[in-house]
């Protein structure tokens, strides 16, 4: 049980750092421009940031669950599809996805989930 919790916390921290770096440091201007083009303000209040933190740990929980039951590649694929592909479909459908970001977001998000799975696997198997 302690290893599961440690894996959850470590992979959740990694996912949170990765998401922050990608969306607040690297690509925030893309998001702001996309929302401005729609006549909207990009939501980045504290409550929005807290929800992204919660999302990061929900994804970490999914990763830990899958890593314990599947092979590493299967766990990465399932978690990535469940978290990112479904999110992109929804925000594309709402017309708020800056599709040009996918060129960068796809490989970075696969890397994010893969490293979270590796972190989880190493902690669980230690």
PLM ranges: what are they?
Residues 1-126:
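Juxtamembrane/disordered regions of integral membrane proteins
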């Amino acid at each position: 049980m302690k290893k599961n919790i440690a894996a959850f916390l470590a992979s959740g921290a990694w996912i949170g750092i990765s998401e922050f770096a990608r969306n607040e440091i690297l690509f925030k201007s893309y998001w702001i421009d996309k929302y401005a083009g729609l006549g909207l303000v990009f939501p980045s209040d504290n409550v929005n940031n807290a929800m992204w933190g919660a999302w990061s740990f929900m994804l970490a929980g999914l990763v830990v669950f899958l890593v314990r039951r599947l092979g590493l590649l299967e766990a990465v694929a399932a978690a990535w599809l469940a978290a990112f592909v479904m999110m992109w479909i929804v925000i594309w459908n709402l017309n708020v996805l800056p599709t040009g970001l996918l060129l960068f977001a796809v490989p970075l998000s696969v890397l994010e989930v893969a490293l979270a799975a590796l972190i989880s696997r190493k902690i669980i198997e230690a």
